[in-house]
């Protein structure tokens, strides 16, 4: 159920776009997937094998209730038909109407090859992003991520008019294929949310340029997180 909560985290609260307030559950190639997005970030989880064709947009509020009631249980039975879905947890069942509509073609946002790939220790990265976030309040949480392949350093920078420039760096493995600087601006809260969802000691940051989607991967292949860059 951890994968459910980590996916539903990025669903939208904007009721004018009801499809984005839900989580898309679907099957493809014999696997069951769950994906959500608010238009600024996206999370995809690979859940389990599925022999049935599934395509349903579930209200994120329903999934939040499922996670709350699940407790220490590791399995939940799911049944859906037409416009309803039911979750069976021991002696409790939760039934909800599905959100009507077609989910966005999100896979086109996920880069298959990237010009820039940075691998860092996840815990160390979280530390310096938290520091940068404190200095980034004037810029609506925007921070600059920059990789230096020569020095093998990843720097996180934020700028304020009162406190000036704050930069922290950590060691990183950096692969650069492009000619442009290995740099991108991201929302610090969105980045911290993603880093806290990923599992494993290391995290990979992959992108194709400062205006391209940023793909973040942990050490487990069942979860992918994407953040759209901040234009600066």
Residues covered by each model-derived region:
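DNA polymerase processivity clamps
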Residues: 1-99, 114-232
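Specificity-determining recognition surfaces
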Residues: 105-106
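Bateman (tandem CBS) regulatory domains
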Residues: 109-113
């Amino acid at each position: 159920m951890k994968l459910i909560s980590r996916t539903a985290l990025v669903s939208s609260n904007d009721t004018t776009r009801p499809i984005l307030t839900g989580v898309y559950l679907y099957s493809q190639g014999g696997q069951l997937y769950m994906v959500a997005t608010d238009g600024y970030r996206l999370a995809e989880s690979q859940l389990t094998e599925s022999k049935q064709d599934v395509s349903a947009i579930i209200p994120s509020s329903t999934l939040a209730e499922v996670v709350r009631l699940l407790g220490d249980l590791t399995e939940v039975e799911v049944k859906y038909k037409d416009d309803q879905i039911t979750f069976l947890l021991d002696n409790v069942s939760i039934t909800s109407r599905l959100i009507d509509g077609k989910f966005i073609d999100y896979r086109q946002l996920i880069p298959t090859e990237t010009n820039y790939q940075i691998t860092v220790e996840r815990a160390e990265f979280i530390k310096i992003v938290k520091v940068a976030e404190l200095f980034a309040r004037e810029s609506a949480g925007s921070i600059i991520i920059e990789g230096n392949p020569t020095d093998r350093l990843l720097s996180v920078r934020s700028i304020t008019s009162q406190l000036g420039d704050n930069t922290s760096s950590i060691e990183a493995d950096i692969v650069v294929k492009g000619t442009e600087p290995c740099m991108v601006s991201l929302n610090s809260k969105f980045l911290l949310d993603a880093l806290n969802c990923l599992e494993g000691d290391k995290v990979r940051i992959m992108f194709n340029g400062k205006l391209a989607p940023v793909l973040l991967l942990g050490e487990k292949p069942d979860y992918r997180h994407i953040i759209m860059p901040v234009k600066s």
